[in-house]
From Swiss-Prot:
It catalyses: orotidine 5'-phosphate + diphosphate = orotate + 5-phospho-alpha-D-ribose 1-diphosphate. GO terms for molecular function: magnesium ion binding; orotate phosphoribosyltransferase activity. This is Orotate phosphoribosyltransferase. Orotate binds at residue 126.
Length: 209
């Protein structure tokens, strides 16, 4: 079993991911979606958490060997980022969604040295907008962001476009394609459900038609 399929399996088993193609969820954006993900739950399961953090360390060493600092996005990327930084013996910082409205007004907590090569950690990629905002904030502070890592991606075309336009490399441990494949094998969805889930990936607006 590959790392991507093992993580997909774990996410389903611990109910970090729910698949309901016949009774879709409504995302904050208004999109009707057959999938809902809350990867924060992974922190409560030591075996899954270890699998994820070791996976992150391996991927970062392979894809971004020149990394000098790890940063987590607030709030979901913070615990994973801190664990990764500890395992890799690297400095850690975290990036708020917006600057504090009191005190020094920091958006980044932790020391960012100008020109340091940074990898930003996120738990989930939908459109990529929030993590790319975090990347931009880090770069304004002088960091050289060399990539983003995340546990899971919905593989939405908008995310691919956003990362390409930003010129930021994205590496994820697992993905939507792998997850729905594993879900069918493990009996979490029917054959009809699988077809609906495939249609959602192709077009988020018309998949129910």
């Amino acid at each position: 079993m590959t790392l991507a399929s093992q993580i997909a399996s774990d996410l389903l088993d611990i109910k970090a991911v729910y698949l309901k193609p016949e009774e879709p969820f409504t995302w904050a954006s208004g999109i009707k979606s057959p999938i809902y993900t809350d990867n924060r739950i992974t922190l409560s399961y030591p075996e899954t958490r270890t699998l994820i953090e070791n996976g992150f360390v391996k991927k970062i060493k392979e894809e971004f060997p020149e990394v000098e600092v790890i940063a987590g996005t607030a709030t979901a990327g913070i615990p994973h980022g801190a664990i990764i930084a500890d395992k890799m013996n690297l400095p850690f910082a975290y990036i708020r969604s917006k600057p504090k409205d009191h005190g020094a007004g920091n958006q980044i907590e932790g020391r960012v040295v100008k020109g340091e090569k940074m990898v930003v950690v996120e738990d989930l990629i939908s459109t990529g907008g929030s993590v790319l905002d975090a990347v931009a904030a880090a770069e304004r502070e002088g960091a050289d962001v060399i990539g983003v890592v995340a546990i899971f991606t919905y593989e939405l075309p908008k995310a691919e476009k956003n990362f390409a336009e930003a010129g930021v490399k994205l590496v994820t441990l697992s993905n939507y394609t792998e997850l729905i494949k594993v879900a069918k094998v493990k009996g979490y969805i029917t054959a009809d459900g699988l077809q609906l889930l495939k249609k959602f990936k192709e077009n988020q607006e018309t998949w129910q038609d």
